[in-house]
Structures are given as structure tokens and as C-alpha cells.
Amino acid sequence: LGLNFTLYAGLGFQIIALSALALYSEVLQSSAGLASFSLAYVVISQGLSGIAKDLTKMSAKSAVKWLAPDSDGTLFRWVAFLTGSKNAVKGSGFLLGAALLTFIGFTSALWSLVALLLVVLLLLVFIMPSGLTTKNKSAKLKQVFSVNSHINWLSGARLFLFGARDVWFVVGIPIFFYSILSDGSLSQNRTAFFQIGFFMSFWIILYGATQAITPKLLNSASRSRYSIIRITKMAVLFLAVILAVLTAVTAANLLSDRALFYVIVIGLFGFGFVFAINSSLHSYLILAFSDAERVTMDVGFYYMSNAAGRLLGTFLSGVSYQFGGLPACLACATILCLFSWLLIFPLANLQKQG
């Protein structure tokens, strides 16, 4: 239906999701506090919020394909800036959310965000140029799945790459940090939650900044697609090495809790730097390989793989932590990274032959 529609739909769904969460207490009262209904209500609202985010992200990145020329590294620079700034804003959002919760409370914070998004949506309706892409109303559902081998291999690599990140980020790292920073008392719990939230937001901001400057770090204007794929392959292998070292250090149990905490923090920053470069390269490659006529479907398929990877990582994060703690999470992340690395080989071979 075109990028304008998907962008508006993304913002609209986000407004609906936030409004639903803001009304949670009233809905909970009307359902007589039924736990199963309450859980389903929150899960559906959060799911709608996730769909909204991906629609908005897909629209923005697809528009870059249409607007930026793929010459002299221009496309790479534009998509890296968009991706990096998006994640920097996401990290800032953690801090803003914490501040809103502290000063005006949960419900008022959500209604404030709803009002802000309504203003943004109305502005976009009036200032957005129409027809960023052609509307292919005859497209079949099966056409969503890409027939481009480059995109299929890249999407597979993306699935395991983000699975490798979330398998230790979702459960392992927050619980490990909490166990080090809190003694279990109410005051220490609050302090620990704030410290962990601040650290993760700071990490995401730096992660986004690294993504934005990746073209400059790699001198992208002078590099071919094949060269960029080779760098991607080396970067994901380096990620696996970082994770393997962290796995060995945590499993050996030779360090004190405090010393291990600092090792993990250093490892997080090293992992984040390389992961940001790799993610930025992926974001460029998906647009470079997409056909202009079906860019929304190609990018949508790619982000479907991204979402599947995050689901896989979240599931494995809980399971692996349950059975083996942080070392098991890190070991699982290492394996997923290696899978991502292996899937880059066919992509490199295809590009070399082409």
C-alpha cells in the first residue's frame, strides 16, 4: 500500500498500544483482577507495540532505498545514520521513561507519549510527500518471501545474530547485574534497577553512535559490496570469540563476583562495538540487495527474520539461564553467533560469482 500508509499505520498502532496500556488499571478492575486476562491484555498490547515499531522502522529504511543513490557510499552513510540515530533515541527513551515514571507516574507517562505521537502523526500527514513507492495491490502473500538468494542468506544470518545478542541480554545480564548490585532489600532493589536501566540505556546510545559512524570507520566510499560482506563475516566471528572468552571466564568461576562484574562490563562494551558495526553492515546490505520495486517486502521479510531471531534469543535466554546460569547463556550465544557466521559464506560466494 506504499510507505506512507505503513508509516502512518505504525504510528497509529503505537498510539493504540500505549492507550491500551494506559487503561490497564481500569480494565483490570472490570475483569475482577483475573490473572489470565490481565496477562493476555498486556501481552497483546506489547505485541501490537512491537508490530508498530517494525512497521515504522521498515517504512523509514525502505524510504532510504528510494531516496539515496547507491554510489560513493551514500546509501551506506544514510542507512547507517538512520539506524544509529534510531538506536540512540531508543537508549535515550529508557532514560526518559525512567524520568517520567519517577515524576508523573505510569499512567500519566503513557498518556504523555500518546499525545506526543498524535502530534507527530498529524504533522507527517500534512508534510509527507505522497507516493514514496508504487502500490502493488496484486501482490500475493507468498511474494512476501524473498526469491533473492542474497536476501535469504542475509536474513538467516540476521536471525542468528540477534538471537545471539538477546540470549544473554534478556535474562542473563539483568539478573547477573541485579545479583551483584543488590542485597535484596527494598532500597537496594530500587537502586539496582535504576543502575541497570541507566547502564543499558547508556550502552544502547553508544551502540547507536557506533552504528552511525560505521561508514566513516570503514571508509565505505571505497569499498565494494563483496568487501563489506567479508568485513561482516570477520566481525561476526570476532563476536563469537568475545562470547567464547566470556563463557570460559564465567564457567571457570575463578574470579570474585565483583571482578567478574567488571569483566562482563568490559566484554559488553567490546561486544557492543563489534555488534554495532555488524548490524550497520547488515542494514546497508539488505537495502543494497533489495529491488526498488519490492523494497518494502524485502525489508519486511528481513525484519521478520530479525523478530524471529529475537524471539528465539528470548526463549533460549530463559531456558539456558534456568539450566546453567550466565555461562549457559553465553555458551548458547556463542553457538548462535557461529551459525550466523556460517550463513555469511554462501552470501559471500554469491556476491563473488556475481
Regions found by a protein language model. Name each.
Residues 171-196:
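Short amphipathic helix-loop junctions that connect adjacent transmembrane helices
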Residues 128-164, 183-188, 219:
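Juxtamembrane intracellular "pre-TM" segments in multi-pass secondary transporters
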Residues 108-126, 328-346:
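Symmetry-related core transmembrane helices of the 12-TM Major Facilitator Superfamily/SLC fold
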Residues 196-223, 238, 242:
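Transmembrane alpha-helices of Major Facilitator/SLC transporters
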Residues 228-279:
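C-terminal transmembrane helical hairpin of 12-TM major facilitator-type secondary transporters
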Residues 70-82, 193, 290-302:
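Loop-to-transmembrane helix entry/capping segments in MFS-fold secondary transporters
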